[in-house]
Amino acid sequence: MARFELQKLYIDGGYVDASNPETFDAINPANGEVLAQIQRAGKDDVERAVVAAEKGQKIWAAMTAVERSRILRRAVDILRERNDELAALETLDTGKAISETRYVDIVTGADVLEYYAGLVPAIEGEQIPLRDSSFVYTRREPLGVVAGIGAWNYPIQIALWKSAPALAAGNAMIFKPSEVTSLTTLKLAEIYTEAGVPNGVFNVLTGSGREVGTWITEHPRIEKVSFTGGTDTGKKVMASASSSSLKEVTMELGGKSPLIVFDDADLDRAADIAMMANFYSSGQVCTNGTRVFVPNALKAEFEAKILERVKRIRAGNPEDENINFGPLVSFEHMESVLGYIAKGKEQGARLLCGGDRLTGGVFDKGAFVAPTVFTDCTDEMTIVREEIFGPVMSILGYDTEDEVVRRANDTDFGLAAGIVTRDLNRAHRVIHLLEAGICWINAWGESAAQMPVGGYKQSGVGRENGISSLAQYTRIKSVQIELGDYASVF
């Protein structure tokens, strides 16, 4: 029997039954428990959500900027009041350690909403003089109804990253969470309504990407799709969005990011950064620095420092505050990660630690994979080329700066990159050469609300967060005013 009641769709300010009779299960990956049955939206539900969003968006956009800002700030306050409750639910649904969800996921999501709530009154047009008798003014108008499609690794945070700028700009949003982790997004919808966001301005449709995601992407009256997920799926979403009605898109996709340790680096700091870049959130972070480049002369010393730190990982029940490493998000994903680990062994990478499923005690019922470190890796190996999205670090040796920059850029992805060095000149020189949209020097992973994030190459299109993302949820209308005579050639 499920722990929670049947989860319905959230449309037009409240829960409604789906037109589709099918449901799917939300599973706790720490122990296999069925948390809830969730209704699967039908195609008619997508249309119902669009109609509600169109109605609500007109009301929302007609409010003054200050009114919209106040309502969004109320939502921030409610999020913070319910931080622990939301974090507990997120941990059950994702398997993420409560130490992450309680102190990072909800907190940083609320920070992003607060950031955009403060920017609402700053959405302004321009006045452009042409001549004494004429000028142009511009208006930044909302797009209308937009859609967000989320990934399973940061459910409520991603929903906030997408909805905050969209709502701040006066749009309505239809959001489809990942089928794997849907629960907290439904709670976010409740919070928006409680804060005073008009009915229909934030709707949640649950179900598969293959069906519900496709119907959303193809709907002709949705003006934009913001998608977070894998590159292959992102390409399909982008193609569908374009072919259906030339929708605008934001794509935050996969990565295989390089972390370069230089020969002057503080190796203890470098090892700490590498651990965070590979094992935080059990390795399920799109920006992870999974290709760790280390000078050959320092590789053995660096490996020893990594092994020393792996021993400090506290794996176990993610509801335990002392744990910092939980299960993977699902048993299906666990099998995928184990398959990559097997390929690493087959292709000749040297296994330093891990390499298998964690077993015994609490681990037997959950989707736990041991923190895994491979070394003596080569650029052609599958574990070095493809995104694994799990706790698997690959260490690669190198000799020269030119070599490591070339190899770091030898990937179809370009989401993130980082370097560790004491040489500030080298730091800036190398960062400017790396083909990645998010870069860190002597750090890894922080993505503040003010910081635009997004990828180069096949890691994405557009940006999330920062002022520029707010503009991506508006369109510019140009208006010319003529005060003088008008001359016709006819």
Swiss-Prot record:
GO molecular function annotation: betaine-aldehyde dehydrogenase (NAD+) activity; metal ion binding
* The name this protein goes by in its record: Betaine aldehyde dehydrogenase
Which PROSITE patterns does the record associate with it? Answer: ALDEHYDE_DEHYDR_CYS, ALDEHYDE_DEHYDR_GLU
The record lists the catalysed reaction(s) as: betaine aldehyde + NAD(+) + H2O = glycine betaine + NADH + 2 H(+)
At the top level, the lineage of the source is Bacteria
* One BP term from GO: glycine betaine biosynthetic process from choline
Q: Which residues bind K(+) 2?
A: L246, K457, G460
Family under the similarity heading:
Belongs to the aldehyde dehydrogenase family.
Per the record, the gene is: betB
Q: What residues bear Cysteine sulfenic acid (-SOH) in this entry?
A: C286
Describe, as the record does, how this protein assembles with itself and its partners.
Dimer of dimers.
Q: Name the source organism.
A: Pseudomonas syringae pv. syringae (strain B728a)
Q: Where does NAD(+) bind?
A: G150, A151, W152, K176, P177, S178, E179, G230, T231, D232, T233, G254, C286, E387
Q: Which InterPro entries match?
A: Ald_DH/histidinol_DH, Ald_DH_C, Ald_DH_CS_CYS, Ald_DH_CS_GLU, Ald_DH_N, Aldehyde_DH_dom, BADH
Q: In which pathway does it act?
A: Amine and polyamine biosynthesis; betaine biosynthesis via choline pathway; betaine from betaine aldehyde: step 1/1
